């Protein structure tokens, strides 16, 4: 797990401009806050600020930018374990998390608001799977 987290913390988009799904070119801008639990839905491909990791969530692989500090939280470690089980440790590029986007957003919001105790139960109830860290 440590090599995966180290690798994820080094992932950054090195291009100066990127293409979105329709092929239009967008130049990245830095509009990110310095919040510890920053999660921003990336509507277009953009550069990843230092200390953050790009994450694709769900079957449609919606892109989010997540603070690397969030990766150490036990609930997020459970999501990383689920990702490792489904995709293995050999996946390249952006991390894929097999979780419903709504569930992911609720998990992040509960972590941000400090009510993370019920987060594992929330994930299990909405996704039908257990993401315990044991």
Swiss-Prot record:
The keyword S-adenosyl-L-methionine does not apply. Its main location: cytoplasm. It comes from the Eukaryota. One of its GO terms (biological process) is auxin-activated signaling pathway. The keyword Cytoplasm applies. It is found in: Cytoplasm. Pfam families: Auxin_inducible (PF02519). GO terms for cellular component: cytoplasm. Belongs to the ARG7 family. Interacts with and inhibits PP2C-D subfamily of type 2C phosphatases such as PP2C67/PP2C-D1. Provide a mechanistic link between auxin and plasma membrane H(+)-ATPases (PM H(+)-ATPases, e.g. AHA1 and AHA2), and triggers PM H(+)-ATPases activity by promoting phosphorylation of their C-terminal autoinhibitory domain as a result of PP2C-D subfamily of type 2C phosphatases inhibition, thus leading to the acidification of the apoplast and the facilitation of solutes and water uptake to drive cell expansion. Plays a role in the regulation of cell expansion, root meristem patterning and auxin transport. This is Auxin-responsive protein SAUR40. The lineage of its organism: Eukaryota, Viridiplantae, Streptophyta, Embryophyta, Tracheophyta. The gene is SAUR40.
């Amino acid at each position: 797990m440590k090599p995966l987290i180290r690798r994820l913390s080094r992932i950054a988009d090195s291009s100066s401009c990127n293409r979105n799904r329709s092929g239009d070119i967008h130049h990245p801008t830095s509009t990110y806050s310095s919040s510890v639990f920053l999660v921003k839905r990336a509507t277009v491909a953009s550069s990843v600020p230092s200390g953050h990791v790009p994450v694709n969530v769900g079957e449609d692989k919606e892109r989010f930018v997540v603070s690397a500090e969030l990766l150490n939280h036990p609930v997020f470690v459970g999501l990383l374990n689920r990702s490792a089980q489904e995709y293995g440790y050999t996946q390249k590029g952006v991390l894929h998390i097999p979780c419903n986007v709504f569930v992911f957003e609720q998990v992040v919001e509960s972590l941000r608001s400090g009510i993370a105790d019920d987060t594992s139960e929330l994930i299990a109830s909405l996704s039908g799977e257990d993401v315990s860290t044991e």
